[in-house]
Every structure is written in C-alpha cells, then in structure tokens.
C-alpha cells in the first residue's frame, strides 16, 4: 500500500514494525505537498526542516528500543489559529501576519508528548469567520475534489490537506460548523467534540462559548485516535470539563448499532435541502435500519431559530475577543499615525478583512445600550432553550441524524458577495455549537457531478463513543 493511502493505525504499525521509517513518511508527504500545494493553496506555513528533524529523532528512539508515543512519526497539519511555539500563527489575517507564539496550545503539547510531527499550518477563513476559506488574507484554498469549488470553512485548509493526501490527519476548530462543513465538502471525516472535552488554551478565540478544537482524518478510527490524544481536563482552560473521565474511543468502535434508536428531525428535511443530499439522507436511513438500528422521525422546532441566535452570540463574543488587536500590544501596526487613537483606528481598518469587520460591527451593535436586551439577551435565552431541547431529545434517542449543509460544495466566488446566503449554509451545524453537544461529519455519497456529500451524527454531551460506533458502522458499508 502507498504511504499516502495509509491510515494512522497502518502508519503506526509500519513504523513500530520497522517496515517504514518516520523520515520516509514525512518525505512522502512533503513530496506530495510540493506537487499539489501550488494548485490547492492549503498551507500558510510549511515546517519541512523541523518535521524531518523530529522524524529522525523518532526513528532513533525506535532503533534504540526506547518507548515512543501513540502517534510516533505521524505527520499532522494544524489550523493556523492554534498556537505553536516558534511557528508562525496568523489566523489567516494581516493583523497577525508575522505573529510567532512563545508557547504551545495545550493540544499541541499533547501531540508532541505522543511524538506526532507537525508538518505545517493550514489556511482558514480569517479569525475562523466564514464558510468557504475565501476570507483568508493570504490565499483562497481550493477543493481537491473540484478545484473550481470551495473546500468549505472555516477549517477549509484542514479538510483540504487530508483530502489531497497532503497530511494524514489534521486539527481544526469548530464554532458553528467549521470542522464538519469542510469535512463534508472535501469528503473526509471531521468531529466537533463536546464543548469542554478538548482544551481551548492556545486557540485564538473567535467566540469563546462556542469554539472547540477537533480532529479531521481519512477514517472514523483516525479521528477517534486523535481525539483520545487531545482530549482531557486542562487547568489552563477553566471551561474544560473536570467531571468527565478520559475514554478509550477505539474500544467497542466496531460493535455495530443494533438496538440503537436514532432520530431524524423533520425540520432538517425542508425545501431548502438539495435533492441529492436528501436522497443521501434517505438512503442512510435505510442503511441504518438494515444494520439493526431503529430510525424515527422526530421534531426539534426551536432549532429553526438557531441561526439568528448563533450569529448574534458569536458576533458579540468576537467583538469582545478581537478588541485586543489594536496595534499597540501586538499585531499589525501602520507606519504612519498621528496619535494613539489614529494608531488603533488605522491598525484595525487596514488589517481586518471585510467579514471580520462586518461581524465586529454586528456584535458591537448587539451589545450596545438599548439593543442588548432585544438582541444579545434574547439570543442567550434561545441558546438555553436549544440546549434543553436537545437534552430532552437524547432522553429518547441515542443519536440524531442530520445533513451537514443544505447545499453541495459551491463555486469559488459564488456566494462571496452575498453574506446572507453564506450564513444560511450553516443552518444545520450551528445548533450543535449552541447546545455544546458533539457531532461527526462523515462521507455519505457523491453527487452526479462527483462532489462529496456528507452527513452528520449528533450525540448527547460526552456521547463521542456512541457517535464513533455508529459512524464506523456506516463507514464499513460504503
């Protein structure tokens, strides 16, 4: 089997059995990056010298019989809003074009502790605000399945590198669908974990109550393995869960779904859903039944209002979080300015892109005197209702089935001029973030034009094991 086609498990076994060297694997991926990167535009920063040095160190440990981590020698790509000590972290923004963090995010520390090898930082929508990776200040990433189309966003680079075989696994972040939608558009697997399961320390914040780091990979098992490494309580993140015991996500992953009860919300099968995606969902329902699951129509009425609540809450939190980028403490600074006020105004005007400015303005408006109660407070009440509605649903159902996106991967530039249409593409994903529950996106089928179609499986808080089991059962049927 070719190195680029191997799963994490296959790569690890080949390294430990000394059939392959980590250095050979890293070189194979960099060779493929050099072939495909000019067309795909997925990487912002490549770490070839660093990665080869780390790979040689892993090979030396194995040759000496030393103990190595569970991801020893495995290359991984990192979304460029996750801090990496000594490696540029830009958030795909002019504001942070030369920012080099002096520390590692907690997830990066955990990856390094397991001997994973960072091969580069990947493109994204600026400050994770977008659904197409067209909002990057540096480049537009293309979908490896059809280079005239977007890879999704905001973690478009994270999904594209896995789909293009330019990394076996990657990390993304998900605030309103930013792992799941790109995974669906690029035909890979991506998980948004339960809020608090993975530390956010070192993740440059967009909306702190919604952001969550998660894995993307070729297979369900790859994502389960990566989640096991990065999950767990962190004293540096006071929102990380202190109650949940660390789990073995691979244990029982092949046990099947016989006896599971899966809900299909009727609100998710509305007229705005592309007919080919609807057919994929219908076919999946029949497949789930044939595997022994019970699939029932259900209702989640409050979720129809989730999109408006999401954009108010996320924009309000972004307005607050991005206030720190002022040209004084760090970030872009113009050459000419008259005084401190001009410095702040010019820095933000020149360094933030249009979408970031749009959301800062929306968030500031929602938080302003006279509108706080009408917009922000009301959105928070709706968020609580959505969380409760999902909680009640999971008292009767093990999992919930859903589309990921109402549309197939769209053409580059098709929706850029119409922010509302872009926002509507998140209609099936944002409620999961508002509720704080986990959800996985996995490939379901392909359209008549050969475009990937993904589906979502939603679970209760800390229901990742159940999600992985069901996703794995469907994956084996493909």
From Swiss-Prot:
Keyword Ligase listed: yes
Keyword terms, alphabetized: ATP-binding, Ligase, Nucleotide-binding, Protein biosynthesis
Active-site residue numbers: 79 (charge relay system), 154 (charge relay system), 178 (acyl-ester intermediate)
Listed EC numbers: 6.3.5.7
Gene Ontology annotations of biological process type: translation
Residue ranges crossing the lipid bilayer per the database entry: none
Reaction(s) catalysed (UniProt annotation): L-glutamyl-tRNA(Gln) + L-glutamine + ATP + H2O = L-glutaminyl-tRNA(Gln) + L-glutamate + ADP + phosphate + H(+)
UniProt feature coiled coil, ranges: none
Gene3D superfamilies: Amidase signature (AS) domain
GO terms for cellular component: glutamyl-tRNA(Gln) amidotransferase complex
InterPro entries for this protein: Amidase, Amidase_CS, Amidase_dom, AS_sf, GatA
Domain of life, per lineage: Bacteria
UniProt GO MF annotations: ATP binding; glutaminyl-tRNA synthase (glutamine-hydrolyzing) activity
Functional note: Allows the formation of correctly charged Gln-tRNA(Gln) through the transamidation of misacylated Glu-tRNA(Gln) in organisms which lack glutaminyl-tRNA synthetase. The reaction takes place in the presence of glutamine and ATP through an activated gamma-phospho-Glu-tRNA(Gln).
Subunit comment: Heterotrimer of A, B and C subunits.
HAMAP family, per the entry: GatA
UniProt record similarity statement: Belongs to the amidase family. GatA subfamily.
Protein name, as recorded: Glutamyl-tRNA(Gln) amidotransferase subunit A 2
The gene coding this protein: gatA2
């Amino acid at each position: 089997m070719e190195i680029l086609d191997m799963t994490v498990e296959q790569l690890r076994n080949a390294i430990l059995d000394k059939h392959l060297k980590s250095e050979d694997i890293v070189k194979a991926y960099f060779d493929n990056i050099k072939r495909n990167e000019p067309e795909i535009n997925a990487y912002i920063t490549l770490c070839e010298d660093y990665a080869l040095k780390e790979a040689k160190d892993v090979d030396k440990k194995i040759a000496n019989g030393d103990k190595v981590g569970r991801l020893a020698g495995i290359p991984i790509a990192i979304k460029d809003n996750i801090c990496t000590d000594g490696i540029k972290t830009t958030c795909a923004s002019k504001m942070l074009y030369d920012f080099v963090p002096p520390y590692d995010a907690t997830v990066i520390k955990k990856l390094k502790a397991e001997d994973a090898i960072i091969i580069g930082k990947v493109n994204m929508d600026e400050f994770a605000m977008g659904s197409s990776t067209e909002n990057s200040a540096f480049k537009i990433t293309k979908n490896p399945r059809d280079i005239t189309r977007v890879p999704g966003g905001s973690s478009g680079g994270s999904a594209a590198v896995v789909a293009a075989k330019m990394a076996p696994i990657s990390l993304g972040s998900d605030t309103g669908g930013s792992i799941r939608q790109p995974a669906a558009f690029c035909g890979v697997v991506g998980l948004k974990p339960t809020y608090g399961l993975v530390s956010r320390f070192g993740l440059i914040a967009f909306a702190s109550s919604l952001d969550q780091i998660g894995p993307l990979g070729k297979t369900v098992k790859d994502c389960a393995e990566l989640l096991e490494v990065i999950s767990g309580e962190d004293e540096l993140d006071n929102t990380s869960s202190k109650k949940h015991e660390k789990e073995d996500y691979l244990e029982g992953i092949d046990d099947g779904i016989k006896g599971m009860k899966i809900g299909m919300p009727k609100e998710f099968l509305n007229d705005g859903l592309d007919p080919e995606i609807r057919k994929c969902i219908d076919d999946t329902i029949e497949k789930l039944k044939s595997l022994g699951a019970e699939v029932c129509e259900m209702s989640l009425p409050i979720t129809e209002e989730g999109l408006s609540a999401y954009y108010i809450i996320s924009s309000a939190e972004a307005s607050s979080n991005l206030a720190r980028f002022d040209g004084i403490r760090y970030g872009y600074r113009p050459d000419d300015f008259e005084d401190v006020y001009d410095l702040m105004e010019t820095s933000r005007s020149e360094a933030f892109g249009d979408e970031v400015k749009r959301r800062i303005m929306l968030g500031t408006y929602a938080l302003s005197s006279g509108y706080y109660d009408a917009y922000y407070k009301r959105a928070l009440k709706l968020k609580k209702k959505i969380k409760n509605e999902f909680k009640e649903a999971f008292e009767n159902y093990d999992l919930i089935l859903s589309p990921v996106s109402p549309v197939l991967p769209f053409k580059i530039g098709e929706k850029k001029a119409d922010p509302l249409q872009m926002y509507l593409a998140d209609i099936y994903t944002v409620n999961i973030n508002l509720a704080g529950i986990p959800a996985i996106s996995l490939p379901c089928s392909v359209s008549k034009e050969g475009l990937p179609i993904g589906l979502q499986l939603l679970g209760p808080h800390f229901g990742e094991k159940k999600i992985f089991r069901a996703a794995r059962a469907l994956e084996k049927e493909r």
